[in-house]
Amino acid sequence: MKVLFWGTPDFAVKSLKALIESNHQVVGVITQPDKPRGRGQKIQPTPVKEEALKHNIPVFQPEKIKNNQEILETIKKLNPDISVVVAYGKILPEEIINIPKYKTINVHASLLPEYRGAAPIQRAIMEGKDKTGVCIMEIIKELDAGDVYACREVEITEDDDIISLHDKLAEEGARLLIKVLDKIEKGEIDKKPQDHEKATYAKPIEKSEGKIDFSRSAKEIFNQIRALKVWPKAYAKFRDEEVKILDAKIVECNLNALPGEIIKADEKEGIVVKTGDGCLLLKIIQFPNSKPITTQDAIRGYKIKAGERFE
């Protein structure tokens, strides 16, 4: 089939690569405009654009897609059999969704109808789920509410964070996408409506959600740290500075101390901090304008001692 691909970040690149390697033909790619990225804030192409250009696939980057006659005409000229959307970043209007023969499908990183919306991977980790998944669904006007072609479960382990789970879901989504497209082409697949009464929403992550409240349980804080490792990063005040906490582990402890208090600062083990119901061993932290370091190095470099407190 002739496929028009809509996508922007790294998550979408796996699906684009799988499409390029499949029997289907990618007739065009629509992605977000180039934006400043990285420390130097240089204008850079999106990851999807970079991949498409390697394969000489036409790339289009409209500033807006609503009421955009030019992009409508472009899509009609490309004449795709189906549009595939993977983390494009904007909601497509109905007039665009309905152009291709087989309409428009989406790779969504949750087990729908759970976690519709913008941040399904982070929310699944933050809420302590032990599994999530990917679904291929038909796009309709309502957000992530279309009929579902297929889903695959993915386990969330204690070792997973936003980076590892993102990659697992991107891989699984790409594999499932090709299977679904092959079956759509052969007319061998049915779609099923979602149970809308069971729908939950994964609202966008806000920067303020990175602030750690050490009176919460060790498990809740551990989930917060690993869910927000890319952005905004979990953080707490220490010596009047905002220190980011990038990696931690739940450990047993039976000492009485205030939440956030350092109960152990060991150059071999690291920093152990009291929480509402237990303790966390902090493994990697980052002081302002510094690189991430192990807590063993932080103890040596910043002379951190037991009795000090994260707030």
Swiss-Prot record:
Keyword Protein biosynthesis: yes
Catalytic activity: L-methionyl-tRNA(fMet) + (6R)-10-formyltetrahydrofolate = N-formyl-L-methionyl-tRNA(fMet) + (6S)-5,6,7,8-tetrahydrofolate + H(+)
Keywords: Protein biosynthesis, Transferase
Enzyme class: transferase
Family annotation (Gene3D superfamilies): 3.40.50.12230
Name of a matching Pfam family: Formyl_trans_N
Record GO cellular component, one term: cytosol
InterPro entries in alphabetical order: Fmt, Formyl_trans_C, Formyl_transf_N, Formyl_transf_N_sf, Formyl_transferase-like_C_sf, Met-tRNA-FMT_C, Met-tRNA-FMT_N
Binding locations of (6S)-5,6,7,8-tetrahydrofolate: 110-113
Superkingdom in the source lineage: Bacteria
Signal peptide interval: none
Enzyme Commission code(s) on record: 2.1.2.9
SUPFAM superfamilies: FMT C-terminal domain-like (SSF50486), Formyltransferase (SSF53328)
A Gene Ontology molecular function term of the record: methionyl-tRNA formyltransferase activity
Entry keyword annotation includes Acyltransferase: no
Family per record: Belongs to the Fmt family.
Function as written in the Swiss-Prot or TrEMBL entry: Attaches a formyl group to the free amino group of methionyl-tRNA(fMet). The formyl group appears to play a dual role in the initiator identity of N-formylmethionyl-tRNA by promoting its recognition by IF2 and preventing the misappropriation of this tRNA by the elongation apparatus.
NCBIfam families for the chain: fmt
PANTHER family listed in its UniProt record: METHIONYL-TRNA FORMYLTRANSFERASE, METHIONYL-TRNA FORMYLTRANSFERASE, MITOCHONDRIAL
Protein name as catalogued: Methionyl-tRNA formyltransferase
Organism: Sulfurihydrogenibium sp. (strain YO3AOP1)
